[in-house]
């Protein structure tokens, strides 16, 4: 396992930040503690960069060059989307929760790589500065093949 702390210390990529696919803010929410405790018991480690992380550009130049969303800190709209998806997990079926979490992470990573889930803060994203929550909802529905891709 390579923790986020180790990645930040040993693998510095200029112009990029480490991004938690499932944000720490959500992991710390009291309502989700039982679910995340179950996830840990099933072997899911939210601090494992390979499982729960990816590099995203933190400069407009790199966002343009790599066509990825700009990451410059907190991203409350992204967090809200992830929170809503996790809240929809089937709490009665412990055996399906790990699968649902892995599917969510895979879908979020893929959508971020396609620049479909903008990480908005006060700074502007050169490709998705006009994106809003509706855009993120459409991308989320595509993750579960509920809408055709464009």
Please place each PLM-identified region on the residue numbering:
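Betabetaalpha-Me/HNH-type nuclease active-site subdomain
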Residues: 1-68, 129, 133-149
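C-terminal, well-folded lobe of enzymatic/effector domains
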Residues: 60-150
